[in-house]
Amino acid sequence: MLVSDFDFYLPEELIAQEALADRSSSRLLHLSRSTVNFEDRKFVDFPSLLRSGDLLVLNSSRVFPARLYGHRAGLHAQPVSPRNPAARDFLHGRVEVMLTRQIGPQEWQALVRPGRKIGVGEKIFFSAADSARALAAPVSAASPSEPNDPGSAALAQAAELTAEVIGRGEFGERTLRFEPVPNFFATVEKLGHVPLPPYIAREDRPEDRERYQTVYARAEAIGSVAAPTAGLHFTPQILADIRERGVEIAELTLHVGLGTFQPVHVENVEEHKLHRESFSISDAAARQINRALAEKRRVVAVGTTTVRTLEFAASQNALSSAGTATVSAGAGEADIFIYPGFKFRVVSALLTNFHLPKSTLLMLASAFAGRENVLKAYAHAVEEKYRFFSYGDCMFVE
């Protein structure tokens, strides 16, 4: 199976750059797997597509402002050409860091820019001044002369966060160890920026802190560096309407990490490997899911992150005596890669946004609905000018 099998034509103007004023005013393409029919709807119709007794499963992970701007200490300066913008940033010590996954009490995996010049042993200082300066002149577009650049001593004194590079991963990511602070996430909330995906061609704005977050994201479930975007369409009223229809709602957590930004570099789909992402399923959620499966009720997953969590959890358990899948409560790390040929054990229906060409998320949707069906649906969505990707419209497959 080739990655090119999952390519499709997408005009650039259909990539949503802004969130809609009303979350629930997005469009919804309804795809029936049995009839392969499409129906153009609005998301406000979604509750009517659910059945009494369905179990709707949400990912309640909370996005944090994971993009940090800082300065390096300059302890390991390397000779670089000032003609290159990234090299100029390096000479001035400017660094952009995208935290992707917490791997220890003070340790994080991160993407670093300019990446090739930041070696093990480097120290990076983060302050409010760094953040403001980066928005005025984004990293890798710095002026070749910045006479007001502070020196290393001043940076260290002003820093509210300090990290040392302690490792480098196989995909180019760095491992950072942060010096302890009283409340790490509170400091990141102050200094950080919303990690909008690269296809949103603008800087983040204050309103993105609300709109690039589901209304049901829980404060205690903070840890995602990208939103579980299928959930962005929900409002409290929509959730109330769903409950009134006799639909049960369960929540789990999967912290969206580096895999969201990871392109597929191989030609054969089967050779691709996903990064691990942390997840947790509570005792209450596990009971809800197992009861629905035992009673042969539909499990409706909101988003690909929910699908991966459910199917990974089920893959760790044997079938019940009745031959149904089960999940266990607990925490772990999921690296399940779902593409056509995968046998779904838990999910009966899927709400998902429109995904990038040749992406692992499109492969997951194709595994669930059939590649040809999904590509036909996407061609219809392009023709009808649906909005694509994170701030775009959605599709319900049943």
Regions found by a protein language model. Name each.
Residues 142-143:
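Extracellular attachment/recognition segments
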